[in-house]
Amino acid sequence: MVSFGGIARKLFGSSNDRRVRSFQPNVTAINSIEEKTKALTDEQLAAKTAEFRALLAEGKTLDDILIPAFAVVREASRRVLDLRPFDVQLIGGMILHSNAIAEMKTGEGKTLVATLPVYLNALSGKGVHVVTVNDYLAQRDAATMGRVYGFLGMTTGVIVHGLSDEERRAAYACDITYATNNELGFDYLRDNMKYEKNQMVQRGHNFAIVDEVDSILVDEARTPLIISGPLDDRSELYNTIDAFIPLLVPSDYEIDEKQRSANFSEEGTEKLENMLRQAGLLKGNALYDIENVAIVHHINNALKAHKLFQRDKDYIVRNGEVVIIDEFTGRMMPGRRYSEGQHQALEAKEKVQIQPENQTLASITFQNYFRMYDKLAGMTGTAQTEAEEFGNIYNLDVIEVPTNLPIKRIDEDDEVYRTFDEKFKAIIEEILDAHKRGQPVLVGTTSIEKSELLAERLRKQGFNDFQVLNARYHEQEAYIVAQAGVPGAVTIATNMAGRGTDIQLGGNLEMRIERELGEIEAGPEREARIQAIVEEIKELKQKALTAGGLYVIATERHESRRIDNQLRGRSGRQGDPGRSKFYLSLQDDLMRIFGSDRMDSMLTKLGLKEGEAIVHPWINKALERAQKKVEARNFDIRKNLLKYDDVLNDQRKVIFEQRLELMESTNISETVSDMRREVIEDLVEKHIPERAYAEQWDAVGLKTGVTNILNLDLPIEDWFKEEGIGEDDIRERLTEAANAAFTEKAERFGDDIMHYVERSIVMQTLDHLWREHIVNLDHLRSVIGFRGYAQRDPLQEYKSEAFELFTGLLNNLREAVTAQLMRVELVQQAPAEPEPPLMQAHHLDPMTGEDDFAPIYQASEVIVAPENRNPEDPTTWGKIGRNEACPCGSGKKYKHCHGAFEQV
């Protein structure tokens, strides 16, 4: 039966349809001036940029010049790239310009769409940032689309890992800057640790277009970017505590897979207290006494390491190191680490060398970083399922852009089997059948373990004609993805999300040319070979189309519908036919967590035999409801975490703004004088209480404070004995004495040196106290949840205590700066420029207590002797010169072999 909502949508169209239609008049206007724009010479077309900028200088708005600007970009794209944006792509560009998210299906040309609003907004001269998920995509898109911007007289920069500050500054100074979300966030944090404004690299946050916006603003929303420095080695403690966990029995702890949490029962707590007491690690009588907070943290991490984290699913052990596997993409993240000691707990569990912990020096979440932009937009193929979150947190609407050609993909109902083995047997039969028919197959799995299990079972069937794409073999993933659309190809992939390379039926032309013709110089031979490849791909594409297009087989449903939709969306690009189907079993994680026991008994009663599947739209709906529950829970977690993070964010803004003011100032004497006055106020208030009798005044305490902080030897006891003296008199005498001592010192130093010393001491002290403050807030955050047991709101308690800590930070700053300046003495050589601390970049995931960590760069920098390289294992090669022979033995240069796709 059709609902009233359905009838209304048929009559009036959905709200999305109405939003899309609202852009149609502009599309018509752009089309109406297309011929006129085509008639312009290259020079006249390029001159339009200066013309538009002049109009903006006269007071016109970006909206006023949208129509001619879009027409100019469309024509420039046609001339430079031989790509003319379709009408729906113009609509996509307008959606991005209007501070919204454009949902565009795979293969609909998101990269080209971005050029329209990027050019328009870059005309303001304030800079536009195009955000991608990895360095490879940033470089690829900047190189390709930079040709269009360059043709129109605009500069394009790209920020990737490994650039110097000078190179970064130059890239940010360009009209358009392509960068990864990580590099942008880390540059912001590093800028706010600099000591001179001219050392900073970013120039503001005007407009950002975020590609794969759901991945960055939802999946990674909970993952703070962290700059940290090393702490003392505590590996012995980790090993000691790790040895306790195997001695526990299941009744000693409770595991909640839904919440990704692990807690000890009363029995378990008693056991641990005895073990800790014997090891000399327990302070006091009870484990949960305040002095044992650090030990509780360690044992909780050890329990999670053993009971929640699974080897080959959450991480792998490679070359004696624990390497994280990205939950969403299935890729290894070498160099990244879980924070808060969780990675060390895993290292202790796996009996590998325990790396030292790090102290947070600065951090920010993507949620708070991207909310700094004056204007924000995003692109993705899957955003509707998270529309509420984008609206609530980022104030971004999600608008679905119609496809240029209708989607012909057939999404079949799920097949649900009782056991894992039955499901895999059915999947293998389906793969072999599709392969015989010449249909390309993409099989999506949720973990490395399952992808390799499927591969092993295929081999047992005597079938070896397949490729495996997961974290262990990611060196070759770009080429594997590019060839996944060849007739009969079978590709097994761990979570295809974020792969960054299109699956084109027949194969990827650019990839094949690069791989096969990289050594051949331009000329007739190269052109002939290219033409032969073009014809071959055309023929292969026709065969794949005849066989039904790309067939996506999913071996399990993910917690998020969006990840499932991303996998499905790999098929049926640009109007091609395709097919998708999910194969499930009652032993799958999602099914098990959401009551598969009841369903199993029901299916047994219904007489479902071994090897039979249940297929019904109701099953799909039930699973989607389960996924919606998980998504809603995850959204609530992210929303709640943001409330806590906003407390730190507000304080961070105050500190960073204060630092910027200090960097921009050449003379902060007035600020220093105010600090000194307030310190004296505090000293007097502390030792001469209001309305107290003179006999109750603390002369000894005040003298000690004056000596320690103001570095003055004053007859305070004698002052206190004077007849009729009041606290105002004491305050005035202290102020005069401190000011006189400081003025005398300033005259000896000279104005320039004194101003430099003041600024250096204030900034270094502020940085030191801010780092301590971050650690204190982390500790507060880790225990504040227990206030809920006392019927108090943990968030309000956190806000209140965080404010007290911040007030304490400001008081300590005034006191420490005053004490240092009253003691500082001039040496013969000028003081050295303060050095930033030893730093590492990390990427934390607080939702599960995990931490994505990011010195991503270490492994590839090691030089390995040729005789120690295994040709079949790229992880043993180390750093290789671009023009060296590829260690795999192909005979090609590294840049034309494995090096061609190492950054994907």
From Swiss-Prot:
Topology within the bilayer: Peripheral membrane protein
Q: Single Gene Ontology BP term? A: protein targeting
Instruction: Give the molecular function GO annotations.
Output: ATP binding; metal ion binding; protein-exporting ATPase activity
Q: Which cofactors does it use?
A: Zn(2+)
Subcellular location field: Cell inner membrane; Cytoplasm
Q: What does the entry comment about cofactor binding?
A: May bind 1 zinc ion per subunit.
User: What SMART domains does UniProt report for this protein, alphabetically?
Assistant: SecA_DEAD, SecA_PP_bind
State the EC number(s): 7.4.2.8
Q: Which residues bind Zn(2+)?
A: 886, 888, 897-898
On subunit structure and binding partners, the annotation says: Monomer and homodimer. Part of the essential Sec protein translocation apparatus which comprises SecA, SecYEG and auxiliary proteins SecDF-YajC and YidC.
Q: Which HAMAP family match?
A: SecA (MF_01382)
Q: Could you identify this protein by its name?
A: Protein translocase subunit SecA
